[in-house]
């Protein structure tokens, strides 16, 4: 028998990164759309900030954001500042609802894939970045790999173009 003196034992038993927490909340959007059903082929978001069919629901460090591939506090700060400014814009313009479209979410997903394909990250087939640690989870590279500075510029351009890709009412 071997004995090891330890101060701490950390059991890393796996987790459903980026989507698990949201899916487990059993969120229902417009027309009784269930988030788990909507993401059955993989997560779709616009900028990792919003999900088509789920108005007024913002996500922070969600799939499609740079989150886990950058300094998390910095990514969270960028997301929160952007969302705060967006809500201020809504209040100033008397908007009660914000959503995005399926089309813009799909287009953003293509940009996420293009950024990832410039790296080796998607080639690691057993990575949690792809959801490979969860049985039957669709294999989709979830974080935006273009870097936080590029992502921030994209968000700024969208804001400066009247929140292109977002629909207000």
Identify the function of each model-found stretch.
Residues 5-7, 38-39, 140-143:
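Short amphipathic beta-strand/extended segments with alternating polar/hydrophobic composition
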Residues 2-3, 50:
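Structural alpha-helical scaffold elements that stabilize or flank donor/cofactor-binding regions
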Residues 4-16:
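Short hydrophobic core segments
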Residues 16-65:
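Glycine-rich loop(s) and the adjacent beta-strand/alpha-helix scaffold that form part
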Residues 8-10, 37-43, 109-112:
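Short amphipathic alpha-helical surface micro-motifs
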Residues 45, 58-169:
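C-terminal, flexible cofactor-proximal segment of oxidoreductases
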């Amino acid at each position: 028998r071997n004995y090891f003196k330890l101060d701490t034992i950390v059991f890393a038993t796996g987790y459903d990164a980026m989507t698990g927490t949201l899916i487990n909340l059993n969120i229902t959007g417009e027309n009784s759309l269930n988030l788990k059903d909507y993401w059955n082929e993989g997560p779709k978001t616009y900028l990792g900030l919003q999900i088509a069919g789920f108005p007024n629901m913002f996500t922070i460090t969600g799939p499609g954001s740079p989150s886990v591939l950058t300094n998390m506090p910095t990514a969270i700060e960028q997301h929160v500042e952007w969302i705060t400014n967006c809500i201020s814009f809504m209040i100033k313009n008397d908007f009660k609802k914000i959503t995005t479209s399926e089309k813009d979410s799909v287009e953003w997903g293509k940009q996420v894939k293009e950024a990832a394909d410039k790296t080796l990250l998607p080639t690691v087939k057993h990575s949690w970045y792809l959801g490979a640690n969860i049985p039957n989870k669709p294999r989709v590279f979830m974080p935006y790999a273009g870097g936080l500075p590029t992502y921030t510029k994209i968000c700024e351009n969208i804001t400066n173009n009247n929140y292109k890709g977002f629909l207000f009412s």
